[in-house]
From Swiss-Prot:
GO terms for biological process: gluconeogenesis. It catalyses: oxaloacetate + ATP = phosphoenolpyruvate + ADP + CO2. Belongs to the phosphoenolpyruvate carboxykinase (ATP) family. It comes from Aeropyrum pernix (strain ATCC 700893 / DSM 11879 / JCM 9820 / NBRC 100138 / K1). This is Phosphoenolpyruvate carboxykinase (ATP). Involved in the gluconeogenesis. Catalyzes the conversion of oxaloacetate (OAA) to phosphoenolpyruvate (PEP) through direct phosphoryl transfer between the nucleoside triphosphate and OAA. The gene is pckA.
């Protein structure tokens, strides 16, 4: 059957019990039947079905997939008998926006509320770029993504991350495939700093898998004082167009909350009365305990972006100058500058780090092309699109190691210092002939010799780098149509 999820959505819209665009106050009241509140008024929800994404239960249908169709047909009667809230919003607010419809099972009003809060208002037209049907009460767990129709069926999960990413996954790839730009799993921020005596605005995109410090570096203001400043646009997904504009996709934020005690700038956004805490332990007096991970290591919040002191008035970054890829690999220096657009895209497609799984908490080496677990096929299109953008916009691209250089820990304060130093162009570089990129040897007055992997590994460095290079080349050659990038690592 072609476009079976789209057909299911059509039947739901024609026959199911649907309440259209319920106001947030109603959704909050309905959610309070099973949720609590913090002392500041934030809604606090504990998921009953799922507390993290399930990539192993996510299935994407591109053209024909009989197994996919059977899963949808098996759920058909159950879905059409359910009652739904219909939430009409937009991913993005500018000329790269997509109209979306979330059909959320009525028994889970907090999911409808979070969708309303997270995405932008854009009126009711009856025509949508993406549609998701979300039925958490279903007995089996599946995220069924139908690429051609841009429709998703979420079954058996009440974790908001699945609903949110059902739209953002498709928006990123739709932007790429429509040649509107390229969707990127990256945070965006603007620096206004003094460079060589004159004020300059520098737009930065920060990429990184979970656990690499992306949120920490995104909300960092470096203690700058007027006329210098930092403004935060987005923390997760942007669409970078051919003019260098990084279009924001979300009105608010969805951060992990275990970082809140260290990132005080996030606190007002997470504790805002309109915020929604998801699987955060709340004490009997209404105080959230962000350090208690007994419910899950993946506790999150739908946080109110405008409450962050350094939030920008706009979610769109109007000019992108710098890309920063965060990694945690012991062979990498604290900061490296990539020397060509091809090398930059090679590292983009490597998407490598050590990361901690959301539930198990066990560090493991990983490679995810584009630092983006939501990138759909054909992945080579993202590589070629970014290559064209880096060439045409003359962007500088860096790799920042936020883990260890060999076994020496790289402190977060050093990473923050390096980010500001590269934005201010206050870094001395030296070519690492073995790696083929430039490494920072001094930044903003700080000597980095003690973190140079070549010195730390000593005589074994060449062997370590050679093994790493061969491993990287093998990975890149496994991605169709980008094997040529193996020559640049």
């Amino acid at each position: 059957m072609e476009d079976v999820v789209k057909a299911l959505a059509k039947e739901v819209l024609s026959s199911a019990d649907i309440e259209w665009n319920p106001p947030p106050g109603l959704l909050r009241r309905e959610s309070s039947r099973y949720a609590g509140f913090t002392k500041t008024g934030s809604l606090a929800v504990v998921s009953s079905k799922a507390r993290a994404r399930r990539p192993d239960r996510t299935r994407v249908k591109y053209l024909r997939d009989e197994g996919f169709d059977r899963l949808v047909v098996d759920a058909w009667d159950y879905v059409v008998k359910a009652s739904f809230y219909a939430v009409e919003r937009c991913v993005g607010s500018g000329d790269r926006r997509f109209r979306i419809l979330a059909l959320v099972e009525k028994s889970y009003p907090h999911l409808a509320l979070m969708s309303h809060l997270n995405f932008f208002p854009c009126g009711s037209t009856g025509s949508y770029d993406m549609v998701t049907i979300d039925v958490p009460s279903y007995s089996d767990v599946w995220m069924l993504v139908e690429r051609r129709s841009n429709s998703t069926l979420v079954l058996g999960s009440d974790y908001y991350g699945e609903l949110k990413m059902s739209f953002l996954r498709l928006a990123m790839n739709e932007a790429r495939d429509r040649h509107l730009g390229v969707g990127l799993h990256a945070a965006s921020k603007l620096y206004r700093v003094r460079v060589e005596g004159s004020m300059r605005e520098v737009g930065v995109l920060v990429f990184g898998l979970s656990g690499t410090g992306k949120t920490t570096l995104t909300v960092e203001d470096h203690g700058l004082r007027e006329p210098e400043y930092v403004r935060v646009m987005q923390d997760d997904i942007v669409i970078l167009d051919w003019r260098g504009v990084a279009h924001g996709t979300e009105m608010n934020l969805y951060p992990k909350t275990d970082s809140v005690p260290e990132l005080k700038k996030l606190e007002p956004a997470v504790l805002h009365p309109d915020a929604v805490l998801e699987n955060v332990v709340v004490k009997s007096d209404g105080t959230p305990d962000f350090t208690d991970l007994s419910l899950t290591r993946n506790a999150r919040a739908l946080a109110i972006r405008e409450a962050i002191p350094i939030a920008s008035g706009s979610v769109d970054l109007m000019g992108t100058n710098v890309l920063v890829f965060l990694t945690r690999r012991p062979e990498m220096p604290p900061l490296a500058r990539l020397t060509s657009p091809y090398q930059a895209v090679a590292y983009f497609m490597l998407g490598e780090s050590f990361r901690t799984s959301a539930e198990a908490g066990k560090p493991e080496p990983v490679r995810v092309p584009g630092f983006d677990p939501f990138m759909l096929e054909p992945k080579w299109r993202s590589a070629y699109s970014l290559l064209d953008l880096i060439k045409s916009l003359n962007m500088n691209v860096y790799v920042m190691n936020t883990g260890h250089a060999k076994d020496r820990k790289i402190p977060p304060e050093l990473s923050k210092h390096l980010l500001l130093s590269l934005v201010k162009e206050n870094v001395d570089w030296k070519l690492d002939k073995h790696m083929g990129f430039e490494i920072a040897v001094r930044a903003g007055g700080v000597n980095l010799d003690g973190y140079n992997p070549e010195e730390l590994y000593g005589e074994s460095y060449v062997r370590v780098v050679d093994l790493l290079r061969r491993d990287r080349q093998e990975f890149l050659r496994s991605i169709p149509s980008v094997s040529f990038l193996a020559d640049y690592v």
